[in-house]
């Protein structure tokens, strides 16, 4: 569990923002959502493979040159 020390004379909103940032960096919420329900190993593999294909297509789209517009 990430924890922060609230500095002296630090506004509450700033401390909350720092806490949210540390939680985001640790990936706690994404792991919590992933573990909320049981996912069979086969569906997990399929989901990860589909995400890898999607990432690869996205990377290829960014590498290709746009068509000439003349």
From Swiss-Prot:
Belongs to the bacterial ribosomal protein bS21 family. Gene3D superfamilies: Ribosomal protein S8. GO terms for molecular function: structural constituent of ribosome. InterPro entries: Ribosomal_bS21, Ribosomal_bS21_CS, Ribosomal_bS21_sf. Residues 43-70 are annotated as: Disordered. This is Small ribosomal subunit protein bS21. GO terms for cellular component: ribonucleoprotein complex; ribosome. Keywords: Ribonucleoprotein, Ribosomal protein. The keyword Ribosomal protein applies. GO terms for biological process: translation. Pfam families: Ribosomal_S21. Residues 45-61 have a biased composition (Basic residues). It comes from Dechloromonas aromatica (strain RCB). Disulfide bonds: none annotated. The keyword Ribonucleoprotein applies.
